Protein backbone atom coordinates (compact mmCIF):
# COMPACT_ATOMS: atom_id res chain seq x y z
CA UNK A 1 0.00 0.00 0.00
CA UNK A 2 1.23 3.45 -0.84
CA UNK A 3 2.17 5.68 2.07
CA UNK A 4 -0.40 8.14 0.72
CA UNK A 5 -3.17 5.91 2.09
CA UNK A 6 -1.73 5.42 5.55
CA UNK A 7 -2.66 7.68 8.45
CA UNK A 8 0.19 8.92 10.63
CA UNK A 9 -1.50 7.43 13.72
CA UNK A 10 -1.70 3.99 12.09
CA UNK A 11 2.03 3.44 12.38
CA UNK A 12 2.82 1.21 15.36
CA UNK A 13 6.14 1.66 17.03
CA UNK A 14 8.18 -1.48 17.41
CA UNK A 15 9.11 -1.83 21.07
CA UNK A 16 12.77 -2.20 21.90
CA UNK A 17 13.18 -5.19 24.17
CA UNK A 18 16.42 -5.76 26.01
CA UNK A 19 17.69 -9.27 25.46
CA UNK A 20 17.90 -11.69 28.36
CA UNK A 21 21.27 -12.87 29.67
CA UNK A 22 23.38 -14.35 26.89
CA UNK A 23 23.12 -18.08 26.32
CA UNK A 24 25.45 -19.00 23.42
CA UNK A 25 24.02 -21.13 20.62
CA UNK A 26 24.26 -24.82 21.41
CA UNK A 27 24.71 -24.23 25.15
CA UNK A 28 22.18 -26.06 27.33
CA UNK A 29 19.90 -23.82 29.38
CA UNK A 30 20.71 -25.31 32.77
CA UNK A 31 18.53 -24.03 35.62
CA UNK A 32 18.16 -24.88 39.28
CA UNK A 33 14.64 -25.76 40.48
CA UNK A 34 14.57 -22.33 42.17
CA UNK A 35 15.70 -20.67 38.94
CA UNK A 36 12.85 -22.28 37.01
CA UNK A 37 10.34 -21.13 39.62
CA UNK A 38 11.72 -17.59 39.39
CA UNK A 39 11.28 -17.65 35.60
CA UNK A 40 7.68 -18.83 35.99
CA UNK A 41 6.96 -16.11 38.57
CA UNK A 42 8.47 -13.49 36.29
CA UNK A 43 6.25 -14.74 33.46
CA UNK A 44 3.13 -14.50 35.67
CA UNK A 45 4.05 -10.93 36.59
CA UNK A 46 4.51 -10.00 32.93
CA UNK A 47 1.17 -11.58 31.96
CA UNK A 48 -0.56 -9.59 34.73
CA UNK A 49 1.08 -6.38 33.51
CA UNK A 50 0.08 -7.24 29.95
CA UNK A 51 -3.57 -7.68 30.98
CA UNK A 52 -3.48 -4.30 32.71
CA UNK A 53 -2.08 -2.66 29.56
CA UNK A 54 -4.53 -3.93 26.94
CA UNK A 55 -5.34 -0.36 25.90
CA UNK A 56 -1.71 0.73 25.55
CA UNK A 57 -0.58 -0.97 22.33
CA UNK A 58 3.09 -0.09 22.67
CA UNK A 59 3.34 -1.35 26.26
CA UNK A 60 1.21 -4.40 25.40
CA UNK A 61 3.50 -5.30 22.48
CA UNK A 62 6.58 -4.75 24.64
CA UNK A 63 5.23 -7.11 27.30
CA UNK A 64 4.27 -9.66 24.64
CA UNK A 65 7.87 -9.65 23.40
CA UNK A 66 9.18 -10.08 26.96
CA UNK A 67 6.78 -13.01 27.52
CA UNK A 68 7.97 -14.66 24.31
CA UNK A 69 11.58 -14.33 25.49
CA UNK A 70 10.84 -15.88 28.86
CA UNK A 71 8.73 -18.64 27.29
CA UNK A 72 11.73 -19.56 25.17
CA UNK A 73 13.89 -19.86 28.29
CA UNK A 74 11.27 -21.85 30.22
CA UNK A 75 10.73 -24.24 27.30
CA UNK A 76 14.46 -24.84 26.83
CA UNK A 77 15.21 -25.20 30.56
CA UNK A 78 17.10 -28.28 31.68
CA UNK A 79 16.62 -28.66 35.43
CA UNK A 80 19.73 -29.68 37.34
CA UNK A 81 19.10 -30.35 41.03
CA UNK A 82 22.37 -30.80 42.88
CA UNK A 83 21.23 -29.04 46.06
CA UNK A 84 21.38 -32.19 48.20
CA UNK A 85 24.59 -33.56 46.68
CA UNK A 86 27.18 -32.16 49.05
CA UNK A 87 30.09 -34.42 48.20
CA UNK A 88 32.73 -31.71 47.97
CA UNK A 89 32.56 -31.44 44.19
CA UNK A 90 32.22 -28.09 42.48
CA UNK A 91 29.31 -28.41 40.08
CA UNK A 92 26.21 -26.62 38.85
CA UNK A 93 23.98 -25.63 41.77
CA UNK A 94 26.77 -25.99 44.35
CA UNK A 95 27.63 -23.39 46.97
CA UNK A 96 31.39 -22.84 46.82
CA UNK A 97 33.60 -21.05 49.33
CA UNK A 98 37.01 -19.93 48.10
CA UNK A 99 39.76 -17.43 48.93
CA UNK A 100 39.81 -14.45 46.59
CA UNK A 101 42.89 -12.46 45.52
CA UNK A 102 42.86 -10.53 48.83
CA UNK A 103 42.81 -13.76 50.87
CA UNK A 104 39.19 -13.17 51.88
CA UNK A 105 36.64 -15.97 51.96
CA UNK A 106 33.85 -15.62 49.43
CA UNK A 107 30.87 -17.90 48.96
CA UNK A 108 29.09 -18.15 45.65
CA UNK A 109 26.56 -20.45 44.04
CA UNK A 110 26.88 -21.63 40.45
CA UNK A 111 23.51 -21.17 38.72
CA UNK A 112 21.88 -20.67 35.32
CA UNK A 113 22.29 -17.49 33.29
CA UNK A 114 18.85 -16.12 34.20
CA UNK A 115 19.28 -16.77 37.93
CA UNK A 116 22.74 -15.19 38.17
CA UNK A 117 22.91 -12.26 40.59
CA UNK A 118 26.41 -11.35 41.75
CA UNK A 119 25.09 -9.12 44.54
CA UNK A 120 23.52 -12.21 46.13
CA UNK A 121 26.49 -14.49 45.42
CA UNK A 122 24.96 -16.30 42.45
CA UNK A 123 27.13 -16.57 39.34
CA UNK A 124 26.40 -18.04 35.93
CA UNK A 125 27.87 -21.42 35.08
CA UNK A 126 29.24 -19.68 31.97
CA UNK A 127 31.17 -17.05 33.95
CA UNK A 128 34.97 -17.16 33.96
CA UNK A 129 34.99 -17.70 37.75
CA UNK A 130 32.64 -20.69 37.56
CA UNK A 131 34.71 -22.19 34.77
CA UNK A 132 37.93 -21.63 36.73
CA UNK A 133 36.54 -23.36 39.80
Predicted regions located by residue number:
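Broad hydrophobic/π-residue packing in well-ordered secondary structure
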Residues: 36, 76, 108-111
Amino acid sequence: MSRGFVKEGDQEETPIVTPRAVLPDGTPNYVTPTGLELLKQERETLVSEQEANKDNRIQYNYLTAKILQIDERINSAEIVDNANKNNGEIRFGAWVTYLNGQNQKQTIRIVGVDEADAVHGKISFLSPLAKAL
